[in-house]
């Protein structure tokens, strides 16, 4: 049994991670400001004595109160920390770009917390640190330095995650047991129907018989990993003493046109049409994970293909849309 602290525990990845870690009889403390984390995701944990919640924002001074809670609930002991705190959807992080930047900068306080308790720390970084890769760097491996616009609309997230990696690199050199994972597009249950990401958009639009909206001409590509594969990777990476960074994503690559047509195929009752709108500035043309390093370190290899994962995700959203107002 471990004592595990999760920042961003009410979000999409966080909720799935809590689910898996509680199955292993760990005691878990989740911190979330519920800016993008969802209170609906907490229902399943209400009567679980091993899952505790603390509402707080890591960009303000919550750490003294958090340490008091760790002292009282965790016998002043933490084994592992997962930092998932940060809005990850452009629709969400562009609403408050300064707060998005400050959330990434708050990794300094989390590093100090990890060192105080001699805990392992896993930082959820992103494939967005690679920006808009050229053809010579496709797929992207961890040695690629990226092609990021530092003054663009997405910079608050992309550059925030890059500086967070730099901070972790420096803390690692002075003894922080931290590690970095660069997460590629991920989907599955507990996604917010209104988070604006492509799979949640396409599936919800199709289920509601709305137009499936593709931005650009649909030839831009992504690799999509199902959430269960990511959660396996995060837990296995945490077991190692490696710093990384490591990529985690499904190396199968699909265009937006292929994705939209697959969603329509899997929801045959949908009357949705596919429409096209202008591609937002700095939206990457292609993104594909090279997972050689993660596979060699701890055997990470996604098992769930896109069609299988979409079927599971569609079933989740069929239930979710009965309880949620879909805005897009």
Predicted stretch roles:
Residues 1-184, 228, 312, 316, ...:
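N-terminal Rossmann-like NAD(P)+-binding domain of SDR-like oxidoreductases, especially those catalyzing
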Residues 136, 152, 191-195, 252, ...:
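Residue-level signature of the cytosolic catalytic core of signaling kinases
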């Amino acid at each position: 049994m471990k004592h595990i602290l999760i920042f961003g525990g009410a979000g999409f990845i966080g909720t799935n991670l809590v689910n898996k870690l509680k199955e292993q009889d760990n005691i878990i403390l989740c911190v979330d400001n519920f800016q993008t984390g969802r209170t609906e995701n907490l229902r399943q944990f209400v009567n679980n004595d091993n899952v505790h919640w603390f509402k707080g924002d890591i960009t303000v001074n919550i750490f003294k109160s958090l340490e008091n809670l760790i002292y009282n609930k965790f016998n002043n002991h933490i084994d592992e920390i997962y930092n998932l705190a940060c809005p990850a959807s452009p629709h969400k992080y562009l609403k408050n770009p300064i707060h998005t930047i400050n959330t990434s900068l708050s990794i300094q306080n989390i590093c100090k917390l990890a060192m105080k308790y001699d805990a392992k720390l896993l930082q959820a970084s992103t494939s967005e640190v690679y920006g808009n890769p050229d053809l010579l760097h496709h797929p992207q491996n961890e040695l690629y330095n990226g092609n990021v616009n530092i003054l663009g609309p997405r910079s608050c997230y992309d550059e925030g995650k890059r500086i967070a990696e730099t901070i972790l690199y420096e803390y690692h050199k002075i003894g922080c047991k931290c590690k970095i994972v660069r997460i590629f597009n991920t989907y599955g249950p507990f996604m917010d129907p209104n988070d604006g990401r492509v799979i949640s958009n396409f599936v919800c639009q199709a289920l509601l018989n709305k137009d499936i909206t593709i931005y650009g001409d649909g030839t831009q590509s992504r690799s999509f990993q199902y959430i269960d594969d990511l959660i396996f990777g995060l837990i296995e990476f945490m077991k190692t003493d490696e710093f990384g960074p490591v990529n985690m994503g499904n190396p199968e690559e699909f265009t937006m046109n292929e994705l939209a047509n697959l969603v329509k195929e899997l929801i045959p009752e949908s009357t949705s049409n596919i429409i096209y709108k202008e591609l937002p500035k700095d939206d990457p043309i292609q993104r594909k994970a090279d997972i050689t390093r993660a596979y060699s370190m701890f055997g990470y290899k996604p098992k769930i293909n896109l069609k299988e994962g979409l079927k599971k995700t569609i079933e989740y959203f069929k239930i979710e849309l009965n309880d949620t107002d879909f805005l897009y």
